[in-house]
């Protein structure tokens, strides 16, 4: 078992005592230098906010105080045995800031795994400039569900080609669901969700499973206050209270995760397309040293389904 903590080092709530202290003590104080505050605003000092959310105040990432704070917090928990950090909204902070943090954390915790939440842009450059280990592969996430939803596997083919390029410099964090997006079963249905999982588990990367997706949870993300509630439900008190239609999806997760573990070389495999149509693709994921491979066929012509074969052509799994 390995544990990552989620570090929200880009912003704090407006009620944070440090924000109140900063406004009271002024720009020359340590607290004043920690937060990103417009001290010259005509209406008086006004904190700058995160992505337009008036209740979220940004840290001043150009100042030493923010670097010191993040280093202190990260080391505090790494000293106590966690294995790494997920850096929330890492994309909203310049890579140079993360580099200053990482160069002080690495000597003390050389094996810590640092994952940055990055939505778009040059993933490889962000990793190189920040010094972190990996970022969230949103390009592949979008291509997986969109290609199934639109019956257009050319999009998946393009994304897999891009994915190969990223693997030359780092191993991305791959996923088909998380706490910020519409549930995969709501996007593509239960069968489509299992097909998406088959792709996730047969291409390179460090895959993540969002809780509830293994039970075909549904939920639509909405752009409003409380719009994340549907995709972040509480789990029932016991497994007996889970809906029965989640059982086959759970079984598919067990089988495909088992397949992934039996083929650990998939983490940095390279993928090539062998056959491509709008509704059918066959791709091959090969070990980096070329020693072995898996062939995966995705067929969307009727209900979405996937078939996985080993290098000899033997069927390992079929949806």
PLM ranges: what are they?
Residues 1-80, 101, 105-107, 124:
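Substrate-binding/active-site clefts of carbohydrate-active enzymes
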Residues 11, 16-24, 72-75, 83-172, ...:
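Active-site-proximal helices and loops of the catalytic beta/alpha 8
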